[in-house]
Amino acid sequence: FGDIIKPNVKSYSGLELSKHGCDYSSKHYNLKVFNETLENHAKRKIKYDVVIMADVIEHFSDPFTIIEFINEILNEDGLLIFTTFNIDSFYAKITGRNYHWILPFHLFYFSNKTLRSICFERNLEIFKISNDTRTVSVYYLLEKLEKIFPKLKLIFLAIKKIKIFNNLNINVNLFDLNIYYARKISKKHNDD
């Protein structure tokens, strides 16, 4: 991700908890990546115009404090752009307990309404929400479908044995994954 964004900005840095991930990013892509938590990074007092979190907020044990740390490191009118799934989406509702994003390592589940409230209480305003279309392998999609429709597992297993599907990618949008755009509420705006 850093390799894609770096040519389009004046400066870029990333956070990665994996030492291997940091070393790899530095060695292969010449990226500035800190091997530390957001809490420790906030102590550096570095300010950013934009913070991007891709599919990570649901993994934090305390996403509320994480958003507070992000607010601390954002410049005035800075942007937080993040992705996560909407537990209140139509697709999540119709699949119920078989919803494929209900996983042990997802510690929190958010609706658009709760995310707006959580951000606003921490001086960030979500001003745009858009659907996030993903490109996935057919094999990966079939794995997910097996979990959603367990009674059709044998059909999905048979399709997975067709070799052409192992390397075929498709775009998928179940209208449950969203990109959220939030702006730090400026002090001037708060004084009005």
Predicted regions and their residues:
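Short glycine/proline- and charge-enriched loop/turn segments
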Residues: T95-L103, E143-P150
